[in-house]
A protein has these predicted regions:
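S-adenosyl-L-methionine
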Residues: 236-301
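Non-catalytic substrate-recognition/targeting regions of SAM-dependent transferases
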Residues: 102-107, 112-187
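Active-site segment flanking the S-adenosylmethionine/decSAM binding pocket
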Residues: 285-325
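Conserved class I S-adenosyl-L-methionine
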Residues: 205-215, 232
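N-terminal cysteine/histidine-rich coordination modules
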Residues: 1-68
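Conserved alpha-helix/loop element of class I SAM-dependent methyltransferases that forms part
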Residues: 187-208
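Conserved SAM-binding loop of SAM-dependent methyltransferases across substrates and taxa
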Residues: 216-230
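Conserved SAM-binding motif I beta-strand of class I
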Residues: 230-236
Length: 332
C-alpha cells in the first residue's frame, strides 16, 4: 500500500506489523546502555551529541531529541535554558506500549511541537535520519464542535502518517492516522474505551453497531474483530473517513474482509448530509459514511448499538437524542 501522504511504504499490512512489533524498537546486543538523559536539564548542561550504534545503526530516543534541540537552538527557536521536553512530543511511527525506551531506525519518529518553522523542520528532517516528519501542533486536531469548524495541525516537513497497535481481548489491530489532522491517542493495554467495548461484548451487544464519531475507525473495527455482523462507521471529518478506508485495507486479513468498494470521493472537509463513501464485505458487512451524525439515520439503517466516542468534556445530549432510533446508545 502506498502512503497517501508521501507515496512511500509507511503503511503496511497489519499482520506484518504485528509480527515484527516486539523487535521493532529493541536494542541490539552491541547497543550502548540507554543514555537516560534528564529531560528537565537545560540544553547548556546536556552532552553535545549521543552516537548511534555502530552495529545496528539505531539511535536512542534521547539522541534524536537532543539532535533536534541542537538544531532548534542553532536556528534561534529554543535557547540554552530549554530542555528536551521543549522540543515537542516524540511519536514513534508505530505506536506500541513499550517496557523500554525505543531504539530508532530511519524514518521512525514524528516530532509534534509548538513554535516551529518550516526551515527548522526541513533542517531536522534532512539532518536527523530517524525523523520522518515534523508537525507544528496547537490545540486538538479534528472537529471538536461542528459549529466552530475543524482544526488542523501543520505538517511542516516530511510525512505525518503513523499507526498505533490497538490491543483488546478480541485481538490486535493496527490503526493508521494522518497525525496532523487526527488527535493523538496513546495505545495502552486495558484502556477505558476497550474495557467498555469488552463489557458490551460479554453482554452479547456487539452484533449490529454504529460507530457514530469513528475517527480513524478504532472502535468500529474492533467491533468487526469481535464478531459483529454489521458495522457502520461515520465521521464528519474527511481525513478521519479517509483513514478508515485505509485501515480497512491495512487490516482486511485480520478482519476477514474479502471485498472493499470505494463508492464516493467527497471533497468537503466537514460534511453535512451523510454520503456513503465505501463498503466492505466478508465476515462482516461494513459501511463507511462521511456525514453529520445528527443526520446519519436518514441514510443508514439504525443499529442495536450506537457508540458515541466524542472528545472529553463535549456535550453529547443532542447526539444521544438523534441516536434514540438505535436500541441502545453508549457514550465511550
Amino acid at each position: 500500500m502506498d502512503c497517501p501522504c508521501c507515496g512511500k511504504n509507511c503503511v503496511g499490512p497489519a499482520q506484518d506489523v504485528l509480527a515484527s512489533i516486539d523487535t521493532m524498537y529493541m536494542a541490539c546486543p552491541d547497543c550502548a546502555a540507554d543514555p537516560n538523559l534528564d529531560k528537565s536539564s537545560p540544553f547548556k548542561d546536556l552532552p553535545e551529541r549521543i552516537d548511534r550504534c555502530n552495529s545496528c545503526g539505531r539511535a536512542p530516543l534521547d539522541a534524536v531529541m537532543l539532535d533536534a534541540l541542537n538544531i532548534l537552538v542553532e536556528m534561534g527557536l529554543r535557547d540554552i535554558e530549554d530542555n528536551l521536553r521543549c522540543v515537542g512530543s516524540p511519536l514513534i511511527a508505530i505506536g506500541y506500549k513499550l517496557a523500554y525506551p525505543p531504539r530508532l531506525g530511519p524514518k521512525s519518529l514524528i516530532i509534534a511541537g509548538e513554535h516551529l518553522r518550516k526551515d527548522a523542520a526541513e533542517a531536522i528532517l534532512s539532518r536527523i535520519p530517524e525523523v520522518k516528519g515534523v508537525i507544528l501542533s496547537g490545540g486538538v486536531p479534528g472537529v471538536v464542535d461542528s459549529e466552530r469548524g475543524p482544526l488542523e495541525w501543520s505538517l511542516l516537513a516530511g510525512c505525518d502518517m503513523r499507526g498505533d497497535v490497538v490491543q483488546s481481548l478480541f485481538g490486535d489491530l493496527v490503526i493508521y492516522r494522518s497525525q496532523s489532522k487526527i488527535h493523538i491517542e496513546f495505545p495502552k493495554q486495558g484502556s477505558p474505551k476497550m474495557k467498555i467495548l469488552e463489557g458490551l461484548y460479554f453482554k452479547g451487544k456487539v452484533t449490529d453497531v454504529v460507530d457514530g464519531l469513528c475517527g480513524p475507525g478504532t472502535l468500529g473495527l474492533m467491533c468487526v474483530l469481535a464478531g459483529a455482523g454489521r458495522v457502520v462507521l461515520n465521521d464528519i471529518w474527511l481525513p478521519a473517513v479517509e483513514n478508515v478506508m485505509l485501515n480497512l485495507e491495512a487490516n482486511k486479513d485480520l478482519l476477514g474482509i474479502e471485498n472493499i468498494e470505494r463508492l464516493e470521493h467527497p471533497t468537503d472537509a466537514v460534511a453535512d448530509e451523510p454520503v456513503l463513501v465505501g463498503r466492505a464485505s466478508g465476515a462482516c458487512e461494513i459501511e463507511v459514511y462521511h456525514g453529520d451524525l445528527r443526520k446519519l439515520f436518514s441514510k443508514a439503517r439504525p443499529a442495536s448499538l450506537c457508540l458515541i466516542d466524542h472528545f472529553p468534556g463535549s456535550d453529547t445530549r443532542r447526539l444521544e437524542e438523534v441516536c434514540r432510533c438505535c436500541v441502545e446508545t453508549v457514550i465511550v
